[in-house]
């Protein structure tokens, strides 16, 4: 079958299910699914995959939905997360955040861009791939994962561990405007604590104020931030102080201790060991102690987990076969060259590529500027194009 025939077949298959595809995307947006509260969306995805004839559909102990097509040794996985951030400014929205209104060729609503339209595209992309055919030696997995917004990559890590899976390649379907992201920075959350000696605030000299002791550390953080900014190259790390709080008996007491939280974005090559050395230098000569944050959580299935917040940076060569496959699919559908770039945001790729070193790209519909935005939306044609491109990648995967 020629490339032209393949493209025509892909589009004909999509046309036959187009209305159902759009309605499914709308239904996903209409269904609330905050982090660790994705139950109803998980049921929708599971039911849709079964209706579309996936070879196997399962839900793991954490609540991730995984659909399988084919049974070959080579595994290509698509991943989209089901959860969204909340809506805390309802009066500023022109569209109902959970109405999934269609206007000007766009679906509006919370999660439309980040990333329920991408999820719909991956589910229907899998169906189209099954209809047109995939190589006998290939398995396509379509993952609808949980709790990405608060626990980047943890659900995917647990899913792969529980199922003893190691895909040969992964496509994270986060919004890239169908540009191909070949890497992004990692991140870690670091907690710094300083102990004090509490006393009544009317006699502050009877105690030791930990907030005052923290000021030298904060100055060191500001200097570290400047030093990272001044490094040569575009792939720099960064550091930001994002929270500060005290453990105090009352507002008329000197606190017992003070804590700050750092968001440390990681460049390629930065490891737990190198960041540990950096933090030790930062606190040298001060009263502070530090640790990488381990954050407990409970999934929608009531499964407890502990999220270790060190997520490495990653990249992939533009010469890799996965990247070339995405480039070819884009050209097939859009008849033009795609854009390759380094993404600014963090995604589940911190686990697939950063921790597990599985070849990964980020490639999905929607403009990242719309993620978490008021009147969030995704372009319908871009969503359809994504499904066609995903199917094309599956058809040609080797």
Where are the model-predicted features located?
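Acidic-glycine-rich active-site phosphate/pyrophosphate-binding loop
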Residues: 87-103, 167, 182-193, 328-329
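N-terminal helical capping/dimerization or prosegment-like subdomains
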Residues: 2-88, 257-261, 275, 380-384
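A structural signal for short hydrophobic beta-strand segments in well-ordered beta-sheet cores
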Residues: 57, 67, 100-102, 241-244
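Active-site metal-coordination/substrate-binding segment of hydrolases
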Residues: 75-141, 380
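A generic beta-sheet turn/junction motif
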Residues: 69-71, 80, 185, 196, ...
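Metal-dependent amide/peptide-bond hydrolase catalytic core
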Residues: 2-4, 16, 191-398
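Hydrophobic/aromatic beta-strand patches that form the interior of the parallel beta-sheet core
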Residues: 76-78, 143, 171, 190, ...
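Acidic/histidine-rich catalytic neighborhood of metal-dependent amide-processing enzymes
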Residues: 115-185, 189, 398
């Amino acid at each position: 079958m020629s490339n032209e025939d393949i493209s025509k077949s892909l589009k004909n298959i999509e046309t036959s299910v187009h209305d159902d595809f759009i309605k499914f995307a709308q239904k996903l947006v209409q269904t609330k699914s905050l982090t660790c509260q994705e139950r109803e969306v998980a049921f929708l995805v599971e039911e849709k995959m079964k209706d579309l004839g996936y070879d196997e559909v399962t839900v793991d102990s954490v609540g991730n939905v995984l659909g399988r097509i084919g049974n070959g040794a080579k595994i290509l996985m698509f991943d989209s997360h089901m959860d969204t951030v909340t809506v805390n400014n309802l009066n500023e929205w022109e569209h109902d955040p959970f109405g999934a209104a269609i206007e000007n060729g766009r679906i509006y609503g919370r999660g439309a861009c980040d990333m329920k339209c991408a999820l719909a595209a991956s589910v229907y992309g899998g169906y189209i791939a099954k209809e047109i055919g995939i190589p006998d030696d290939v398995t396509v997995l379509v993952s609808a994962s949980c709790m990405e917004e608060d626990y980047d990559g943890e659900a995917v890590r647990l899913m792969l561990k529980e199922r003893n899976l190691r895909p040969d390649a992964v496509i994270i379907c986060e919004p890239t405007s169908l540009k191909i992201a070949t890497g992004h920075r990692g991140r870690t959350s670091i907690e710094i604590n300083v102990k004090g000696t509490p006393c009544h605030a009317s006699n502050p000299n009877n105690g030791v104020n930990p907030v005052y002791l923290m000021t030298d550390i904060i100055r060191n953080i500001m200097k570290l931030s400047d030093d990272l900014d001044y490094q040569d190259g575009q792939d720099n790390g960064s550091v930001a102080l994002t929270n500060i709080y005290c453990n105090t008996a009352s507002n008329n007491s000197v606190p017992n201790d003070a804590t700050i939280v750092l968001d440390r974005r990681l460049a390629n090559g930065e490891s737990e060991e190198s960041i540990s050395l950096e933090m030790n230098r930062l606190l040298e000569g001060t009263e502070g102690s530090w640790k990488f944050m381990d954050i407990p959580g409970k999934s929608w299935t009531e499964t407890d987990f502990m999220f270790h917040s060190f997520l490495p940076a990653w990249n992939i060569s533009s010469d890799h076969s996965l990247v070339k496959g995405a480039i070819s699919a884009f050209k097939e559908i859009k008849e033009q060259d795609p854009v390759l770039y380094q993404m600014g945001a963090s995604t589940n790729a911190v686990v697939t590529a950063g921790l597990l070193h599985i070849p990964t790209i980020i490639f999905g519909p929607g403009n990242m500027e719309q993620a978490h935005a008021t009147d969030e939306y995704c372009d319908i044609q871009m969503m359809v194009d994504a499904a066609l491109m995903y199917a094309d990648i599956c058809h040609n995967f080797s």
